[in-house]
Design a protein with these regions (language model features):
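Aromatic- and Gly/Pro-rich amphipathic surface segment
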Residues: 26-59
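A short helix-loop-beta-strand connector motif used in the catalytic cores of GNAT acetyltransferases and
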Residues: 47-67, 83-88, 106
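Conserved GNAT acetyl-CoA-binding A-motif
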Residues: 126, 133-153
């Protein structure tokens, strides 16, 4: 097995992030992991625009992710950030109506290179994000994974409830069909 390492997304690691996204056609139709950064009315749905937006956010320090590297190649990421950085979440209206605690951080997207799937890299990337959050003084962290209830699902961009439970998160409540709110405090 390879020896994986985590690096924070930054201008210095942009090329690694971009390489991974490009190998997968910008990810999910050219999203470039920008979906949660913008509200629907602000979206262009254009891969080149999304790439430019993501790069600008990285350069401005407003996009965060734990990048997993195998040697010099980025092979996975876990996106995280404050609710201000990542305002767009699925089932937001329901989420806000039932909000009891405003988190310091959100984990919104986990992506693994197709060549590296089923090797535990989602968990490695999630732990990498939690470690980076701890380095930034921690706080309340929420994730919004799919609650698959043991069923197979082809797209799991925000991880699974089981993945988050194994990382020490607690189930808070459901959020729309098939999704839930998970929470953990990182010291």
């Amino acid at each position: 097995m390879s020896e994986y390492i985590v690096r924070a997304l930054s201008p210095d690691t942009w090329d690694g992030f971009a390489g991974l996204a490009q190998r997968h056609n910008g990810v999910f139709g050219g999203c470039w992991c920008t979906y949660f950064h913008t509200m629907h009315s602000e979206k262009t749905f254009d891969a080149d625009d999304n790439r430019s937006l993501k790069r600008r956010l990285v350069e401005e320090g407003r996009a965060h992710a734990a990048l997993v590297y195998d040697g010099d190649e980025s092979v996975a990421w876990c996106e995280y950030g404050s609710p201000e950085e990542l305002p767009n979440i699925y089932h937001r209206k329901q989420y806000e109506e039932e909000l009891d605690v405003v988190p310091d951080y959100r984990i919104t997207c986990i992506f693994v290179d197709r060549r590296y799937r089923r090797k535990g890299l989602s968990a490695f990337a999630l732990q990498g994000a939690l470690d980076l959050i701890a380095e930034a003084d921690g706080g309340v962290v929420e994730g919004y994974p799919h609650d698959t209830q043991g069923k197979k699902k082809s797209v799991l961009y925000s991880g699974t409830r089981t993945l988050f439970e194994r990382a020490g998160f607690t189930f808070v409540r459901t959020k729309g069909p098939g999704n839930c709110v998970m929470r953990r405090t990182v010291p």
